[in-house]
């Protein structure tokens, strides 16, 4: 074996020289140079510096502006809330650990950080599933004139948390485990060992199939059908130009969110799957560290995409930041332009940007 397995950790280095130490007790500078840990620390500080205000303002602006409290926005707010929690409970832990060169919070802290990282990623994924289904049902109309109501949105939010907990919680109760990964400063599910004592193999397979492949299949199916429907409607002029434009704008925003999710998480999932299917193979600590830390940037991009592509929300954000006044003076126009179709809360033939 090219790694060293301990009772609650796995170090991607053989202990032939006797230098390997527990990542909960000693700095791991034999895995990487101290400056590399400093880079990780600076990166996490940047994510906190950006992620905290962006997600907080997304929540605050929506609470302050009643017109933004629409059904589809509940799902997007759910994303912001989960990301905010990740920043506070996960990123701060990882930053401090990187500063010290090892996971200073012990095994309990590792479970906490791993849980919130997994929970946040899964809430994001299942929220995108709910958004994809909403887009499919509203635009493709398989259920005739379906209206995405507040009750549907609440059920969608509850569904994302149930599915995310079904993925993140089992390691807390003995099915698999959370261990330090890569350079041993952040924690995640144990992809490195089979660990029969905690039935690790079955959990990793369950996680990949139920909480990664199936959601992606649903998302690609919904958007595949949606693209075909939009093209057919445009060709046949079945909807008004305003409605078609509104549907396309909402769909574009959600598709961009999906693309960025894939950019952030597919490298991590691919590396994890490779490690799991090549037990004992040789790989360096940076091999898992880079995709793991890159995946954490997902806490920032959804609110940014939402703010960039949603004129109504962007104007409300500017108004809030400027103490109730919009220096660009187009808030009312934006509100009027979107009031007909905001957030899929009207009939299925009238959909606009959330």
UniProtKB/Swiss-Prot annotation:
SUPFAM superfamilies xrefs? Family A G protein-coupled receptor-like
Per its record, what are the GO molecular function terms?
11-cis retinal binding; G protein-coupled photoreceptor activity
Quote the cellular component terms of the Gene Ontology held in the record.
membrane; photoreceptor disc membrane; plasma membrane
UniProt superkingdom:
Eukaryota
Q: Note the Gene3D superfamilies from the entry.
A: Rhodopsin 7-helix transmembrane proteins
Q: Which residues lie on this side of the membrane: Extracellular?
A: 1-36, 97-110, 174-202, 275-286
Cytoplasmic compartment segments? 62-73, 134-152, 225-252, 309-354
Motif position, 'Ionic lock' involved in activated form stabilization: 134-136
Q: Does the keyword Nucleotidyltransferase apply?
A: no
**What keywords are assigned to this protein?**
Cell projection, Chromophore, Disulfide bond, G-protein coupled receptor, Glycoprotein, Lipoprotein, Membrane, Palmitate, Phosphoprotein, Photoreceptor protein, Receptor, Retinal protein, Sensory transduction, Transducer, Transmembrane, Transmembrane helix, Vision
Checking Pfam families in the record gives: 7tm_1, Rhodopsin_N
**Family the UniProt entry places it in:** Belongs to the G-protein coupled receptor 1 family. Opsin subfamily.
Tell me what this protein is called: Rhodopsin
Give the organism the record lists.
Rhinella marina
């Amino acid at each position: 074996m090219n790694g060293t397995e301990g009772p609650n950790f796995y170090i991607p280095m053989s202990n032939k020289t006797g230098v390997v130490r527990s990542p909960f007790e000693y700095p791991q500078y034999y895995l990487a140079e101290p400056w590399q840990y400093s880079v990780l620390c600076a990166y996490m500080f940047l994510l906190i510096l950006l992620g905290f205000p962006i997600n907080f303002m997304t929540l605050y602006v929506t609470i302050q502006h009643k017109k933004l409290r629409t059904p589809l926005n509940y799902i997007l707010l759910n994303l912001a809330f989960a990301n905010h929690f990740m920043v506070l409970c996960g990123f701060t832990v990882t930053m401090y650990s990187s500063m010290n060169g090892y996971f200073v919070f012990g095994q309990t802290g590792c479970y906490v950080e791993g849980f919130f990282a997994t929970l946040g990623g899964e809430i994001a994924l299942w929220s995108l599933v709910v958004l994809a289904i909403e887009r499919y049902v509203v635009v493709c109309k398989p259920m005739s004139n379906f209206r995405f109501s507040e009750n549907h949105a609440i059920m969608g939010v509850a569904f994302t948390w149930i599915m995310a907990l079904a993925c993140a919680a089992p390691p807390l109760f003995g099915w698999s485990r959370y261990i330090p990964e890569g350079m041993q400063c952040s924690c995640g599910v144990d992809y490195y060992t089979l660990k029969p004592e905690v039935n690790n193999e079955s959990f990793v397979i369950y996680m990949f199939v139920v909480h990664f492949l199936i959601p992606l299949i649903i998302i690609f199916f919904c958007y595949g059908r949606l693209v075909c429907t939009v093209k057919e409607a445009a060709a046949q002029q079945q909807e008004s130009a305003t409605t078609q434009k509104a549907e396309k704008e909402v769909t574009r925003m959600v598709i961009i969110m999906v693309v960025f999710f894939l950019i952030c998480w597919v490298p991590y999932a691919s590396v994890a799957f490779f490690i799991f299917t090549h037990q004992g193979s040789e790989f360096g600590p940076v091999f898992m560290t880079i995709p793991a830390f890159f995946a954490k940037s997902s806490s920032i991009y959804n609110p940014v995409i939402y703010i960039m592509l949603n004129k109504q929300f962007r104007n409300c954000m500017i108004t809030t930041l400027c103490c109730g006044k919009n220096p660009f003076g187009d808030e009312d126009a934006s509100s009027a332009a979107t009031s007909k179709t905001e957030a899929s809360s009207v009939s299925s033939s009238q959909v606009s940007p959330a």
